[in-house]
Amino acid sequence: MFGADKGTADKLDGKKLHIGIVQARFNENITNTLAAACRAELLRLGVQEKHIRHVLVPGALEVPVALQAMAERDEYDALIALGCIIRGETYHFELVANESGAGVTRLALDYQVPIANAIITTENLEQALARQTEKGVDAARVAVEMANLLEELS
């Protein structure tokens, strides 16, 4: 939920992490801002620039395929999915939102790699614009927190 109380994570340290980012180009004005906010937060959390791999795909439905290719390489401590799906006049919104989300979740479970899902789904452009920076930052923080947690649990 936008503006929700997300709680406070313990110290987030990304110094030793390798992060993969897959960004959908569709609604590029939004996804570019998501990506910039995400990258800035990763760097702020200590992830080294050289340890961030950022790739672009056409749209949200293609994000899981690229995430899978990254997960199969076993080089990343966490992955991040970035995209923006804005409701239109047809059922296509539900299809893209549901299938991209299911694909991201399935990959995280199948490969046991944390994937921060910041494929935002909104009713309109105004909602997307209001969320683009916060959700990019959130994705970076989730990726770092979950990568560290899974390392601790292994």
UniProtKB/Swiss-Prot annotation:
One of the record's GO cellular component terms: riboflavin synthase complex
Domain of life: Bacteria
HAMAP family for this protein: Lumazine_synth (MF_00178)
UniProt GO MF annotations: 6,7-dimethyl-8-ribityllumazine synthase activity
Keywords (A to Z) from UniProt: Riboflavin biosynthesis, Transferase
Species, as recorded: Acidovorax sp. (strain JS42)
Name under which the protein is recorded: 6,7-dimethyl-8-ribityllumazine synthase
Active site annotation, chain numbering: H92 (proton donor)
Cited function: Catalyzes the formation of 6,7-dimethyl-8-ribityllumazine by condensation of 5-amino-6-(D-ribitylamino)uracil with 3,4-dihydroxy-2-butanone 4-phosphate. This is the penultimate step in the biosynthesis of riboflavin.
Entries under SUPFAM superfamilies matching the protein: Lumazine synthase (SSF52121)
Pathways per UniProt: Cofactor biosynthesis; riboflavin biosynthesis; riboflavin from 2-hydroxy-3-oxobutyl phosphate and 5-amino-6-(D-ribitylamino)uracil: step 1/2
